[in-house]
Amino acid sequence: MGSDTSESNNDWKTQLNIPKKDTRPQTDDVLNTKGRSFEDFYLKRELLMGIFEAGFEKPSPIQEEAIPVAIAGKDILARAKNGTGKTAAFVIPTLEKVKPKLNKIQALIMVPTRELALQTSQVVRTLGKHCGISCMVTTGGTNLRDDIMRLNEPVHILVGTPGRVLDLASRRVTDLSECHLFIMDEADKMLSRDFKVLAEQILGFLPERRQLLLFSATFPVTVKEFMVKHLKNPHEINLMDELTLKGISQFYAFVEEKQKLHCLNTLFSKLQINQAIIFCNSTNRVELLAKKITELGFSCYYSHARMKQSERNKVFHEFRQGKVRTLVCSDLLTRGIDIQAVNVVINFDFPKTAETYLHRIGRSGRFGHLGLAINLINWNDRFNLYKIEQELNTEIAPIPSQIDKSLYVAEDSSAVPIPFPLESLPITANAPQQPANAEPLPPQQTQVQFHAPPQQQQQQQQQQQQQQYQQFPNQQQQQYGQPLMPQNYQQQAYPPQPFPSKGFPQQQYTQAPQ
């Protein structure tokens, strides 16, 4: 009798639309667990269905530690590495605690950037698609009137950036009287000088009886002050035995500024890149570099804070879909952005602080997988390189002439998962959402297809490369015409032909600066 009941209880699992298993090797960052399963947390079946259909198999260490404590109602201060499953660690208990029949905002998730708000809201919708829970995302740069109209409909979970959330609360448009769960992702940024006052003002609109969950990879003094003031006997989780992810191999190339573009082109021709993110230190250099990369024959998008929100959304979503291999951006996308297909991060401009460096390289090697971080440094960066190595207690090695592919390349590229159906990604913040009872969307192919151009076009590209690579960077005030947006880019061959008889200029940048 008992076995029959057990079999009937597991029948629902056979009906799930589970995606292809991710067969890539993983590191102890996500494998060093106590052996629990998601069923051990006694989650409701509808939530378990969403978890398994999203491709989750076992909880990561941060999920294992945080989920039962959050469900129990305790405040949490959690510190874990980038890319180890922090988002699901607070989304899962949130979905478990929210009551679908109560048409009030019951949970508020605050994040520092608009892209992270869109991503987090989609994770909520994906994991909770069988729960009958409504999630709304609200960020600056979108139409306020649309948000006000959306709030006339039932909303259970609100995801947003601090400025817009405070604006809606101050106008008394958002009813937070039943919002007993307040979550801050990237809490160190949320409690920085830019956002701390806003966060404390928002707390004033929440009920006295509330639960606070703070998640981040780094916790400066400002977070400690906030914790003492607002958290009640919090449960502290610290899974940071070391700061950098174990699966990321870090190298530096010592190269003169005028040779950086040549070096970048050589890297493109030598590395096996699935997708790459290239970071620059200013918006001007982001646009300039994206223009130059496109002229070299690579398909390339760029994103920075001065772009319109609709353009940023389009770039972000199309890059996630694999429309291009390369994204050039400022530090706008260093926080929390989870793109599983990214296996290479290149710091075209070396960051000034260890915190920025940590968040940048964390865009590769997501969820315990392998990744590669390459830093192009010049003579002026040598002190920052040493300082960051000391602060993070890590080694950034000189780049070898050949990088072992096993350090960053998955044996089966088709195993790279997409965290949620890409067709459901909204271009605007509050596009109409798919009904909870709708048929599941078909799984996406994650391989990026590129078609080689004719041989004559390849030769022309190669000639252009030889003429152009030495021209970067010229005067930054030089006009390069209108910036190219995604609809204007053409898919190009990948990789283009390398420079004839030119490999890495080893004598220039593989030796440490004296």
Curated annotation (Swiss-Prot):
Chain location of the short sequence motif Q motif per the record: 36-64
Any Pfam family the entry gives: DEAD
Classification via Gene3D superfamilies: P-loop containing nucleotide triphosphate hydrolases (3.40.50.300)
Bias type Polar residues, positions: 1-17, 504-514
Keywords: ATP-binding, Cytoplasm, Helicase, Hydrolase, mRNA processing, mRNA transport, Nucleotide-binding, RNA-binding, Translation regulation, Transport
Amino-acid positions noted as binding ATP in the UniProt annotation, renumbered to this chain: 80-87
Keyword Hydrolase: yes
Main location: cytoplasm
One Gene Ontology molecular-function label: ATP binding
Entry protein name: ATP-dependent RNA helicase DHH1
Recorded name of the encoding gene: DHH1
